[in-house]
A protein has these predicted regions:
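Rossmann-fold dehydrogenase core element
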Residues: 264-266, 277-317
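C-terminal hydrophobic helical "lid"/dimerization subdomain
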Residues: 1-4, 253-254, 297-347
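Adenosine-nucleotide cofactor-binding segment
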Residues: 174-183, 195-253
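Glycine-rich Rossmann-fold phosphate-binding loop(s) that bind the pyrophosphate
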Residues: 159, 182-186, 270
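Short glycine-centered segments of the SAM/dcSAM-binding site in methyltransferase folds
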Residues: 84, 177, 263-264, 288
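Helix-to-beta-strand junctions that scaffold the AdoMet/dcAdoMet cofactor pocket
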Residues: 259-261
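NAD(P)H dinucleotide-binding glycine-rich loop of Rossmann-like/cofactor-binding domains
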Residues: 78, 94-181
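Glycine-rich beta-strand-centered segment in the early N-terminal region that forms part
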Residues: 22-38, 51-101, 106, 127, ...
């Protein structure tokens, strides 16, 4: 069994540190690949710090992963040695239930989807992308187009599919007015994607410090909620609003009122506390309040191809392994523009 270098934490309060982990040889239908880059997602932080419940330690995070195939198992047809590969949140599902066969493997109910870290089908803990290699089922990996840099590909596997899926599902495109709430790791990609789809894009943020960036990414309007009357002025303005923030004091009612009749509000920010929205604001206008969770494997491949075709990519800061804990703290403090990506060659 190969051994590789990785970075792990030992409990909810520990620093990330180097360690050696075992990686299984690829079995039938599996590929082994060398991880080149791994993105840092806020859900890595929640998980590592046991904020979403207890987890097994040591914990190796990372579900935004890009690399190069080094070995293939028996019967593999999707990949060959040397192929560029991306892996996101999923490492397995039954592939037979109604959700899997419809291309929504993340909602597998037979018995459930298996996430990139936590535990595999055998019940044993699995390690994420903060490592130098990984073995994965070929049908839970995607091809990274040649025109997409691997360091850019890593965040595409979670942050970008999280935005791409609801934009596609709810019809962002020519003639549609789309608002992105928040200009962080998710939001800055939502602006680029919606603009590339042909929508008229606005950004709603607390202040104006990121307005120039938003316009460079393709936004045609910018609204700062810290300014008096900003949300109220947007009544009946948008066909689609995607909210990427988790602030408890966000004016959700004002955002619902900012929708046109038949408009859709999608939350991907996962606020910790319940959202309080008077249903009258939803019913009056036939509006929809929805959520969205990543995307299936086929849709993720579609997203990668779309980003390659339209030159959509994240703005990133590349860090080394010793900087992971510091990067976590910066993400929590919203001090990153716009996504940290770990270079595993520094391990």
């Amino acid at each position: 069994m190969p051994q590789v270098r990785a970075y792990a934490c030992d409990d909810a309060r520990s620093q990330y540190h180097p360690m050696i982990i075992d990686i299984r040889e690829p079995g039938p239908g599996e590929v082994l690949f060398d991880i080149k880059y791994a993105g840092i997602c806020h859900s890595d932080i929640h998980t590592a710090r046991s904020e979403w419940g207890p987890i097994p330690y040591p914990f190796v995070g990372g579900h935004e992963i890009a690399g190069v195939v080094s070995k293939v198992g028996e019967g593999v047809t999707k990949f060959k040695v040397g192929d560029r590969i991306g892996v996101g949140c999923l490492q397995g599902s039954c592939k037979e239930c109604e959700y899997c066969t419809d291309g929504h493997e993340q909602f597998c109910d037979n018995p459930h989807a298996y996430w990139t870290f936590r535990a595999g089908p055998d019940g044993k803990p699995t390690f994420g992308g903060y490592a130098q290699a990984m073995t994965v089922r070929e049908d839970f990996a995607c091809h990274v187009p040649d025109t997409v840099a691997l360091e850019h590909a890593a965040p595409l596997m979670c942050a970008v599919i999280t935005m791409y899926s609801p934009l596609r599902r709810w019809g962002a495109g020519p003639g549609k007015k789309v608002a992105i709430v928040g200009m962080g790791g998710l939001g800055h990609m939502g602006v680029q994607l919606a603009a590339a789809m042909g929508a008229e894009v606005s950004v709603i943020s607390h202040g104006r410090s990121k307005e120039a960036d938003a316009r460079q990414f393709g936004a045609t309007a910018f609204y700062a909620t810290a300014e008096e009357g900003a949300i109220e002025s947007l009544a009946s303005s948008f066909d689609l609003i995607i909210c990427t923030v988790s602030a408890d004091d966000l004016d959700y009612l004002g955002l619902i009122r900012a929708l046109k009749p038949f408009g859709v509000f999608v939350d991907v920010g996962l606020p910790e506390n319940p959202m309080v929205i008077p249903m009258r604001a939803v019913v009056n206008g036939n509006k929809v309040v929805a959520g969205s969770q990543i995307g299936g494997i086929a849709e993720t491949q579609e997203m990668l191809d779309f980003c390659a075709e339209h030159d959509v990519h994240p703005v990133i800061e590349i860090i080394d392994g010793d900087s992971i804990t510091e990067a976590y703290d910066k993400v929590v403090a919203s001090k990153v523009r716009y996504r940290f990506v770990i270079d595993t060659s520094t391990f």
